Amino acid sequence: MRFAALVFGVGLSLAALAAPRNADAFERQWHLGGGVGVADGKGLTLSPALAAYAAYGLTDVFDARVEVTARGYHVGSDHNPNALSTMVGVAYKLDVLRWVPWAGVYAGYLAFLDSPPKGSPFKQRDVALGLGVGLDYGISRQLGVGVTLRFDEALSHSSATNFDALLRAEYRWGW
């Protein structure tokens, strides 16, 4: 009788372990967040950056993203140009428990609110391509924090580059 109970218990345990679980995929999930950090550009100095972004989970591994970044450049003179960029892109993410590394490609528009400094490779307005990487940490299903590194290059001039490093926080919903 004891042997039968043991076999039944082990069999029930194995069946429970083999049963399908609910997936925690993130397709159709919305993200809304912001970030603060620094920006650096060719011919410009390290300066503050502020960003806002939205993302939508196309699948459990791909997000569509829209990002707006404001940069307050300081060039060591009275002329301190501010810049805005709006980028749209697709990111591939690798969900690993609470840590989510990701990488994305972007295309968008870069605009200096004032004319860029003389001798700078930047135009006042330009189309840009970008590459971004990040590491997010899920505090909860709804809240996350992370770090983002993004490199943008203006299409009109190959040496017109910009680099952002941001600490981010986001709210998620809609799964």
Model-found features: residue ranges?
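Transmembrane beta-strand segments of Gram-negative outer membrane beta-barrel proteins
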Residues: 24-40, 101
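Short secondary-structure boundary/capping segments within folded domains
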Residues: 24, 41-44, 53-57
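Solvent-exposed loop/turn segments connecting transmembrane beta-strands
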Residues: 39-48, 75-81, 97, 155-162
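Cleavable N-terminal export/targeting peptides
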Residues: 1-28, 175
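Gram-negative (and chloroplast) outer-membrane scaffold detector with strong preference
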Residues: 53-132, 137-143, 165-175
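Extracytoplasmic loops and strand-loop junctions of Gram-negative outer membrane beta-barrel proteins
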Residues: 34-38, 114-118, 150-153
